[in-house]
Amino acid sequence: MSFKEIKSTLEDMDEQSRLSAAHDIMDDTRKNVKSLGKKILNAYEKKQNEIARVKKLYEFDKQFGNIVIAGVDEVGRGPLAGPIVGAAVILELNVEKDLDLILGINDSKKLSSKKRQELSEIIKEKALAWEIASLDNNEIDKKGISWCNNEIFKIAISKLKKVPELVISDGYAVKGIGIKNHYIVKGDAQSASIACASIIAKVYRDNLMGEYAKSYSEYGFESNVGYGSKDHIDAIKKFGTTPIHRMSFLKNII
């Protein structure tokens, strides 16, 4: 068979048949055929490693028992503009097939924008329940960022279609929810549920800031998403503030 025919045949195979065939063609004397086999084997190994990594995230959550667990996380504590956004996600943790795992989930900051967008849709499809809540800059200026951070979690949790028996959060305890809570340092890198909440919250907020960028084009919100980059601070000094700026965060700038 020619290289083109081999490649076409492999593409039509199921995963296990393709893997077996890849081992076979490693004995082929043609470099391009052998390279194709190596590529398939490397891709399979990479996928298996990812499955093992994500299973650990699911197992982390399952350690708390066979109960309904909501993971919560926020994005937007530190920006000079825009809302703070929180999300709550309940996953099916007792997955029987690897296909049911949400591969790729991680701390949202470690993922590309494109990957976050893709995963956000998958998470919403596969989650048993999810909710997003936000409070704007005016509320942040009135109540303070810490109060708002806790409040968005309370709102998101209260809106979930399933009532969680445990809430796990990233770094901070969630107060006043009337539900048992565990907070975990670097939780978005350890817990599947928190990682998923981290992703959908960030995608929601980034998209919102992208919309604001259309109205306030001088500030670069499409790239800095409200954080205090040099260009953003320079724009504030040159053009002043917008209706979405957090005035309580700008005392040392204006």
From Swiss-Prot:
Its cofactor is Mn(2+); Mg(2+). It comes from the Bacteria. InterPro entries: RNase_HII (IPR022898), RNase_HII/HIII (IPR001352), RNase_HII/HIII_dom (IPR024567), RNaseH-like_sf (IPR012337), RNaseH_sf (IPR036397). Keywords: Cytoplasm, Endonuclease, Hydrolase, Manganese, Metal-binding, Nuclease. GO terms for cellular component: cytoplasm; ribonuclease H2 complex. GO terms for molecular function: manganese ion binding; RNA binding; RNA-DNA hybrid ribonuclease activity. Pfam families: RNase_HII. Residues 67-254 form the RNase H type-2 domain. Manganese or magnesium. Binds 1 divalent metal ion per monomer in the absence of substrate. May bind a second metal ion after substrate binding. GO terms for biological process: DNA replication, removal of RNA primer; mismatch repair. It catalyses: Endonucleolytic cleavage to 5'-phosphomonoester. Its EC number is 3.1.26.4. It is found in: Cytoplasm. Transmembrane segments: none annotated. A divalent metal cation binds at D73, E74, D170. Endonuclease that specifically degrades the RNA of RNA-DNA hybrids. Belongs to the RNase HII family. This is Ribonuclease HII. It comes from Clostridium acetobutylicum (strain ATCC 824 / DSM 792 / JCM 1419 / IAM 19013 / LMG 5710 / NBRC 13948 / NRRL B-527 / VKM B-1787 / 2291 / W). The lineage of its organism: Bacteria, Bacillati, Bacillota, Clostridia, Eubacteriales.
